[in-house]
């Protein structure tokens, strides 16, 4: 298995997709899936069903993983 070049806390730039040109911080690394989760990028709205703790339910904005081929490390 090849060494993964990103780690949590790195500053990266999105080089492909809707968020192209955005510089942000890596929140999580998923080496088995070859993806990273970047702060504030690729945000989707998830529906939350009502539960005992959250009786209303509602919507949650969540960052989704981005393939590492679409991300470039930026030297701080």
Swiss-Prot record:
Source organism superkingdom: Bacteria
Molecular-function GO terms, alphabetical: rRNA binding; structural constituent of ribosome
SMART domains linked: KOW
Database matches in InterPro entries: KOW, Rib_uL2_dom2, Ribosomal_uL24, Ribosomal_uL24_CS, Ribosomal_uL24_KOW, Translation_prot_SH3-like_sf
One annotated Gene Ontology cellular component of this protein: ribosome
GO biological process: translation
CDD domains the record matches: KOW_RPL26
Entry keywords, A to Z: Ribonucleoprotein, Ribosomal protein, RNA-binding, rRNA-binding
Cited function: One of two assembly initiator proteins, it binds directly to the 5'-end of the 23S rRNA, where it nucleates assembly of the 50S subunit.
Family to which this protein belongs: Belongs to the universal ribosomal protein uL24 family.
Record's subunit section: Part of the 50S ribosomal subunit.
Protein name, as recorded: Large ribosomal subunit protein uL24
Native source organism of the sequence: Sulfurimonas denitrificans (strain ATCC 33889 / DSM 1251) (Thiomicrospira denitrificans (strain ATCC 33889 / DSM 1251))
Taxonomic lineage: Bacteria, Pseudomonadati, Campylobacterota, Epsilonproteobacteria, Campylobacterales
Gene: rplX
């Amino acid at each position: 298995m090849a060494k993964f070049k990103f780690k949590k806390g790195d500053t990266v730039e999105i080089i492909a997709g809707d968020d192209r040109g955005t510089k942000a911080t890596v929140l999580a690394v998923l080496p088995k899936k070859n993806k990273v989760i970047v702060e504030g990028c690729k945000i989707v709205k998830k529906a939350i069903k009502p539960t005992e703790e959250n009786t209303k339910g509602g919507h949650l904005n969540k960052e989704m993983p981005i393939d590492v081929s679409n991300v470039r490390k930026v030297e701080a």
